[in-house]
Amino acid sequence: MSHTEVKLKIPFGNKLLDAVCLVPNKSLTYGIILTHGASGDMNLPHLMSLASHLASHGFFCLRFTCKGLNIVHRIKAYKSVLNYLKTSGEYKLAGVFLGGRSMGSRAAASVMCHIEPDDGDDFVRGLICISYPLHHPKQQHKLRDEDLFRLKEPVLFVSGSADEMCEKNLLEKVAQKMQAPHKIHWIEKANHSMAVKGRSTNDVFKEINTQILFWIQEITEMDKKCH
């Protein structure tokens, strides 16, 4: 399915956040917000590849850049983007999925667990965590799991089985205690950057993109049956 690229500036305090939307050339239903990790920006090859894959299957996709290592700042920026989409007269979406890579997924998780039930028009449908940074390398005793336990909407984790910031058995233990419906897809032998020895980057991207699309489609199909 064809789509159009639209560049945006989203108000955030007295600044503007750079964003790019891929808008499918059909009536819109669901959208996905994506952002980068501690380094890079919205033009990270993997985010571009994922956005393009989702848009080609009919999903509105917004990527945005928010630089800086201050997680509170990143969370506020993410909230501004979500509010922009929610109140946008231009893109009337039935719901959105919040997503991000590494630190971006932490920001998305925090935004999602602080949505008040009375905001509750079910606009946010799920969370996509790519390389969720559960702990600093070699600091497995300090887990960033508080927000994960507060989530209620469905969560998809896509992580490398050799991720130095997300030990496999630790994420599995955390997931077992979560109240939200969740799924973990492990990319075999991938590190935190999703690099796998002996596998091309595009091949890894393809696996990740396929898993994410399938998971989103499962939820949106269920939505259609319920309404």
Swiss-Prot record:
SUPFAM superfamilies xref list: alpha/beta-Hydrolases (SSF53474)
Gene3D superfamilies the UniProt entry points to: alpha/beta hydrolase
Top-rank taxon: Eukaryota
Record's protein name: Testis-expressed protein 30
Species name: Homo sapiens (Human)
